[in-house]
């Protein structure tokens, strides 16, 4: 059994670690609330943009934008959003498992794949994964802006425009609640039809300028807004996962301290018992 002094030093070390994890838990909780506010603020914009595009696309029968046309999938692109930092449980691992499984399915169909990782962990993973990395972004911070993503996203849009990509997906962790974050793969291009798009008896609208010009602008903004929404959702998921992970670490540190304290008490009791035995033995000898 280790001596009482060594155990006491270990207890002090674990207590210091516990203070750090507790502080990180509180910081993550604060950042998560701010990320949730940004997420809630950006969702209506993305949803409204999708509805407007659906109306314009359905009302413009004489013009079909390339982003709306389905073509044979020979080359698939993924914009994969992960975190810049670790200490967030299995958040990134679960995301990478999902996207690699989807990649495997596409490759089994004979499709080629390329990636656009966002976040330092995503960049690091896909550079070691061996796939083609066409563009990347990292270091977006806790309050990312759409302007920080536009250049990266447009590299993938340009590839789609030139026929180098036939499908484009965004992959991120969707924030469900504090305890649940789900990795999702959402199709960006060609624009998937929603249930709302296939409804009949639509009103006719007069568009100014013409539908072609509107779609040219809106579709690019739509893709950018969907990627931005994914980044915001992933950020909220990251902070929630980190808060939960740090709480678990703090609780585990508490359990470890209790265990060490018990060992320390036993060691101290053994030392006192030994000293008493030596005193009694010495007195008996006299």
From Swiss-Prot:
GO terms of molecular function: ATP binding; proton-transporting ATP synthase activity, rotational mechanism
Bilayer topology term: Peripheral membrane protein
Cellular component terms (Gene Ontology): plasma membrane; proton-transporting ATP synthase complex
KW Lyase (keyword) present: no
Chief subcellular location: membrane
Keywords per UniProt: ATP synthesis, Cell inner membrane, Cell membrane, CF(1), Hydrogen ion transport, Ion transport, Membrane, Transport
Cited function: Produces ATP from ADP in the presence of a proton gradient across the membrane. The gamma chain is believed to be important in regulating ATPase activity and the flow of protons through the CF(0) complex.
Protein name in the entry: ATP synthase gamma chain
Species name: Shewanella denitrificans (strain OS217 / ATCC BAA-1090 / DSM 15013)
Lineage: Bacteria, Pseudomonadati, Pseudomonadota, Gammaproteobacteria, Alteromonadales
Chain's gene name: atpG
């Amino acid at each position: 059994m280790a001596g009482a002094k060594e155990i006491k030093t270990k207890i002090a070390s674990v207590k210091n670690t516990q203070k750090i994890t507790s502080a990180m838990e509180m910081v993550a909780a604060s950042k998560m609330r701010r990320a949730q506010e940004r997420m809630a603020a950006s969702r209506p914009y993305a949803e409204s943009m999708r509805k407007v595009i659906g109306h314009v696309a359905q009302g413009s029968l004489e013009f079909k934008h390339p982003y709306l046309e389905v073509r044979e999938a020979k080359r698939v692109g993924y914009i994969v959003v992960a975190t810049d930092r670790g200490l967030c449980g299995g958040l990134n691992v679960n995301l990478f498992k999902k996207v690699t499984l989807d990649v495997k399915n596409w490759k089994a169909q004979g499709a080629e794949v390329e990636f656009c990782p966002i976040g330092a962990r995503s960049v690091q993973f896909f550079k070691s994964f061996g796939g083609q990395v066409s563009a990347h972004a990292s270091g977006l911070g806790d309050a990312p802006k759409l302007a920080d993503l536009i250049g990266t996203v447009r590299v993938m849009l340009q590839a789609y425009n030139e026929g180098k990509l036939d499908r484009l997906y965004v992959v991120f962790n969707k924030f469900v609640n504090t305890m649940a974050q789900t990795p999702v793969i959402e199709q960006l291009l060609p624009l998937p039809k929603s249930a709302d798009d296939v409804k009949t008896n639509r009103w006719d609208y007069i568009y100014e300028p013409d539908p072609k010009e509107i779609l040219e602008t809106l579709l690019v903004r739509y893709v950018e807004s969907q990627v931005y929404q994914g980044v915001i959702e992933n950020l909220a998921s990251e902070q929630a996962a980190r808060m939960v992970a740090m709480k678990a670490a703090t609780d585990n540190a508490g359990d470890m301290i209790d265990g060490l304290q018990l060992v320390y008490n036993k060691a101290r009791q053994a030392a006192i018992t030994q000293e008493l035995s030596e005193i009694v033995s010495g007195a008996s000898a006299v």
